[in-house]
Amino acid sequence: MGQWKVMILICLYGAVKEFRPTEPYMYEYQHTVLNISEHTLNSEVYPIWTYSYLVALIPSFLLTDVLLYKPILIIEALSYFACWMIFVFGRSVWCMQLLELFYGWATATEIAYFAYIYVKVPKEDYKSATAYTRAALLVGRFLAYTLAQLLIGLNWADYMTLNIINLVSMTFAVFLAAILPHVPWRNAYQKKLEDKKSVTDLESLVSEAKYSDYLKLFFVELHQNLYTIYKNPLVLKWSIWSALSSCIFYQIINYTQTLWGTLPEKENKYNGIPEALVPLLGIPADLITRQMNVNWNRWGDALISVGSLLQAGLLFWMSQSHEIIILYICYIIYRVIYQLTTTIAQSTLALTLDSRLFGLLFGINTFVALALQSILTAIVIDAEKLAIRAQFVVYSGYHIVVATLFGIIFGIWAIRTIWRKRSH
């Protein structure tokens, strides 16, 4: 199959697997239709996603290359399929806990989606491949959430109808994952060797190689890349921010619907609007940020500090507000700020780090973020059993701590810069 046919197929898979119209109304369905209490959902159901994602991430990361991508993509599709089979036919708390387990597996295996295309296209097409595969995800989400809003907002369908549409979509995703071309290990081995400038007579090496040679090269590169990444202080700093920021971001998207659910049910008919607007606003925000001619190595700490303070204010406002429109607006702005700062971090790292190391860096940072989120969940939800509005006050305080940390780093840099100028 030609590389552009593969590109179209993987992008179609990406859009279909993200076509999940149930998501803006998951809490409403579980709370109002299944009659599961807010406390049970917060303390016994939703935390399982965090723990499942954490446990599944490292095996997924390692096995993606070892099993040559496609099997992991199939596991991702099957995990999403299992989620919505449970949504359609499950009714108990135990079923919802099992759903969160599969949801964690599906999220963890998403890494194969981005890794697969890099083995299938030439290196010079990596940039366009990344753009297309990411755009496919955004398109799938936007269409799903827009459809959900129309169906629920206009009373054309109920939550179970959304579940059935979702199940059909995930069934199609399984089919697409199954028909994706497999990746011969020799192709993957050749891709890795192409990045080594010292390698000569590439065709001979590949033709004489064994699968064990491919595995050996993978683990040797893994060790070397870990050292390369974390010996750079700039990469380490942005990695710390990425882990801290992603930790609280995952927590917010996991529990925002619970906060919306504290308002009368009729006001939650519009949950699809903010979820649809986030990817729609995220694309131009991402493009504008990438075009900005700013030295983020110098001003990045200040931006992170200001952005975290703004996010702290938004979360605190959400914790106090009983107006759904305020909650929606704060949520959208919060997500866009996260998108902007993440784009800046990626752009900065792109100037510092070999693009081949991004996947490894993302995997490690995500693992650290999930470990931190697990600790946060254990303290705020499992131990203290805080109500949802009190939780958002804590999350606001978390952002203030992050803002203070990076504000201090920026302050130290500014003082040193001024001192050096005066010394000269």
Curated annotation (Swiss-Prot):
InterPro entries, per database record: Folate_carrier, MFS_trans_sf
A GO cellular component annotation in the UniProt record: plasma membrane
Topology term for the membrane: Multi-pass membrane protein
Compartments where found: Membrane
Carbohydrate attachment residues: 35, 254
Pfam families: Folate_carrier
GO MF terms held by the record: folic acid binding; vitamin transmembrane transporter activity
Keywords: Folate-binding, Glycoprotein, Membrane, Transmembrane, Transmembrane helix, Transport
SUPFAM superfamilies for this protein: MFS general substrate transporter
BP-aspect Gene Ontology terms: transmembrane transport
Bridged cysteine pairs (disulfide): none
Transmembrane parts of this sequence: 55-75, 78-98, 101-119, 136-156, 164-184, 313-333, 361-381, 392-412
Superkingdom of this protein's organism: Eukaryota
Statement: the UniProt record of this protein carries the keyword Transmembrane helix: yes
Similarity annotation: Belongs to the reduced folate carrier (RFC) transporter (TC 2.A.48) family.
Protein name: Folate-like transporter 3
Originating species: Caenorhabditis elegans
Organism taxonomic ancestry: Eukaryota, Metazoa, Ecdysozoa, Nematoda, Chromadorea
Gene symbol of the encoding locus: folt-3
